[in-house]
Amino acid sequence: MASIYLNLMMAFLLALSGVLIYRSHLMSTLLCLEGMMLSLFIMMTLTISHFQMFSLSMAPLILLVFSACEAGIGLALLVKTSNAHGNDHVQNLNLLQC
């Protein structure tokens, strides 16, 4: 069981490093955020089932709801930015630039 948690922690850290490395493109950042949320969901689900804390069984579903909202808003922002500027660079999201 410890190797599963280790793999999930590595997946989370790789996705976090992907956010830090590929922060210039919005699509890459969104994919890395989805990887982080997926690893958190699986880790939370395994922890709840392993320790039999069924009073917290709704927490992974709430995390999935927030993840879906984040993905929807992120994709809407990606479409709006790519239509307005022709690319998906994060620097186009700065409102101070004209």
From Swiss-Prot:
The keyword Electron transport applies. Its EC number is 7.1.1.2. InterPro entries: NADH_UbQ_OxRdtase_chain4L/K, NUOK/Mnh_C1-like. Its main location: mitochondrion. One of its GO terms (cellular component) is respiratory chain complex I. Gene3D superfamilies: 1.10.287.3510. It is a multi-pass membrane protein. It comes from the Eukaryota. One of its GO terms (molecular function) is NADH dehydrogenase (ubiquinone) activity. It is found in: Mitochondrion inner membrane. It catalyses: a ubiquinone + NADH + 5 H(+)(in) = a ubiquinol + NAD(+) + 4 H(+)(out). Keywords: Electron transport, Membrane, Mitochondrion, Mitochondrion inner membrane, NAD, Respiratory chain, Translocase, Transmembrane, Transmembrane helix, Transport, Ubiquinone. The keyword Ribosomal protein does not apply. The chain crosses the membrane at residues 1-21, 26-46, 59-79. One of its GO terms (biological process) is ATP synthesis coupled electron transport. PANTHER family: NADH-UBIQUINONE OXIDOREDUCTASE CHAIN 4L, NADH-UBIQUINONE OXIDOREDUCTASE SUBUNIT ND4L. Core subunit of the mitochondrial membrane respiratory chain NADH dehydrogenase (Complex I) which catalyzes electron transfer from NADH through the respiratory chain, using ubiquinone as an electron acceptor. Part of the enzyme membrane arm which is embedded in the lipid bilayer and involved in proton translocation. Belongs to the complex I subunit 4L family. Core subunit of respiratory chain NADH dehydrogenase (Complex I) which is composed of 45 different subunits. This is NADH-ubiquinone oxidoreductase chain 4L. It comes from Caenolestes fuliginosus. The lineage of its organism: Eukaryota, Metazoa, Chordata, Craniata, Vertebrata.
